[in-house]
């Protein structure tokens, strides 16, 4: 049985003011092609389907179109769970009716994992669906009131209560943070679980962390977000996770390349050098090496980089905190005119003329008079 493992689609995402709807539509078209080319039997979507709990109309329509195409045109089975960005009630709407078409959606944790079984030439494959849950929700399901128990201990207890048949092939789909996963420290405020929670399972399809990777050399994988969703992900590995589930204990995992409409790139250099490059319609963030602020830098950059996400100054950002504190303390003692003069001369890289100083002196004196 051949599976496609997706996660963290974040449909409806706004990337620094740019809607990714067209990019996501383009991605889905390439996924349809991959399904046909690789003869995929089943698609797993491991949470964070939407970017927001209350998605906009465009996002809802795109997800509906995506799922409808997977089931009706690609004729694959689809198993989908909710993530922390999803609204369980909205995503779960009509799920009972959809199951008859081969689309299974699970958005709430229950005492026993939702189990869906399909067959291939080697026998049964059991899929278990574990949507995103909070610690308090899991404690309520288990009937545990211990305030100090870790999430890892809770999940181990929960998994121990499940009725797995380990003589068969078992796949779990979840949305959580598994220690050993890249970027665990970056998921602030969330507790983790250990890979040992999933011992005995043939494949664990996870969502939540956005880098496509394997956890601790076990059959535990994060699909990652197929598209880059922030400048922090500019260097992350992205891909589509394809699993060839053969006989018991025989799993082959391959990462297929993602076809993106636009990539996300971080470019570094002096502004004039960056402006001399060919026009670029990718999503670009610029890190400037200039030691002074450049006039209208963003507007000038957009003439070359049509989808500019923003820019920053590497050397200005690297100012030592002690020096920055001293500068701020000094600035607090300056008059409005002196402060503005300093800003003007830094921005324009030239001394302010006496005529300009007189004009602004008159302006500030007028403002002071109005306030008094």
Task: Label each region the model flagged.
Residues 1-68, 75, 357-371:
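N-terminal active-site segment of His-dependent metallophosphoesterases
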Residues 8, 28, 48, 63, ...:
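Divalent metal-coordination and catalytic microenvironments
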Residues 30, 61-69, 93-96, 100, ...:
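Alpha-helical scaffolding segments of alpha/beta enzyme cores, especially the outer helices
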